[in-house]
């Protein structure tokens, strides 16, 4: 059985867990799943430790400083509803940062549930540069667009939100 453990104690992004001890106890990798790690130096140090231990880090990439209302893309639908939403920049900025840190540290990283075509391109570029980075996309992000919010209401709200170009993440 494989399981992952937290990168940071209590999902707070301030103090790293004992990755070495957790690996010995059976952890297969590390993630603060659903909680973006905002402190770049913390991420760099976690990646250095992960590279030393030859383990994987998995990241949820949404910079909350760009987000006013999470769960819906900042675009035509959010404007129609009078909501600012979450721009792709919130994801793109952390993907770019973490791809470059992975390249610099030699860490293996996974970008979780990618939703932006620009983020996909950054992952591809980082791989070409030699970074050991990959990403996954959920079925709803490559089959639906932000228009689903108009049809399904809050059932179509998620983090990261559905974007405008579903084909760009394939």
Positions of PLM-derived features:
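Active-site beta->alpha loop and helix N-cap motifs at the rims of alpha/beta catalytic domains
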Residues: 8-12
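Short, small-residue-biased leader/transition segments that mark boundaries at the very start
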Residues: 1-3
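Histidine/acidic residue-rich metal-binding segments in metalloenzymes
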Residues: 14-170
């Amino acid at each position: 059985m494989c399981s992952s453990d937290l990168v940071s104690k209590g999902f707070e992004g301030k103090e790293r867990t004992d990755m070495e001890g957790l690996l010995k106890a059976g952890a297969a990798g590390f993630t603060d799943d659903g909680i973006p790690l905002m402190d770049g130096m913390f991420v760099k140090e976690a990646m250095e430790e992960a590279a030393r231990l030859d383990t994987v880090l998995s990241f949820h990439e949404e910079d909350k400083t760009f987000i006013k209302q999470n769960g819906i893309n900042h675009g035509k639908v959010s404007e129609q509803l009078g909501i600012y939403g979450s721009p792709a920049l919130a994801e793109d900025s952390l993907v770019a940062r973490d791809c470059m840190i992975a390249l610099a540290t030699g860490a293996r990283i996974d970008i979780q549930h990618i939703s932006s075509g620009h983020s996909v391109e950054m992952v591809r570029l980082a791989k070409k540069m030699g970074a050991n980075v990959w990403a996954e996309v959920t079925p709803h992000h490559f089959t639906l667009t932000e228009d689903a919010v108009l049809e399904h209401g809050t059932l179509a709200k998620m983090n990261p939100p559905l974007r405008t170009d579903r084909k760009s993440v394939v």
